[in-house]
Regions:
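Amphipathic, interaction-prone secondary-structure segments
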Residues: 12-37
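Negatively charged, low-complexity tracts enriched in Asp/Glu with abundant Ser/Thr
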Residues: 1-16
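Generic intrinsically disordered, low-complexity segments enriched for polar/acidic and small residues
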Residues: 2, 25, 34-36, 56, ...
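Acidic, aromatic-enriched beta-alpha/helix-loop junctions
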Residues: 30-73
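Short, surface-exposed polybasic-aromatic patches that bind anionic ligands, especially phosphate groups
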Residues: 3-4, 24, 61-88
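Residue-identity detector for threonine
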Residues: 11-13, 46, 54, 88
């Protein structure tokens, strides 16, 4: 499977630790106005809950984020569970 994003695989992204630890799936994605990607679960987060990882690492954890690779700057996508389609 090839890397689907137009950004470099080593692009820094924000990932919540719940996802990194395998406790929760990615349910919310934000492609911020500044180009930063955020991959979060459905919980409230403090700054301590977040970490920087590469875009490739986030993609390796959940390849379904490739379905929203063209999400415009300033837009969000979400889903109720990993079996549901992404909504914007």
């Amino acid at each position: 499977m090839s890397f689907p994003f137009r950004e470099d695989p080593n692009t820094a992204t924000i990932l919540c630790k719940h996802i990194a630890r395998g406790e929760k799936p990615i349910l919310y994605v934000s492609h911020d106005d500044d180009g930063m990607w955020q991959f979060l679960c459905n919980q409230e987060h403090t700054i301590e809950d977040l970490m920087l990882v590469t875009l490739k690492h986030a993609y390796d954890l959940d390849p379904s984020i490739g379905e929203i690779k063209d999400l415009s700057l300033g837009k969000e996508a979400w889903r109720e569970n990993p079996q549901m389609p992404w909504r914007t």
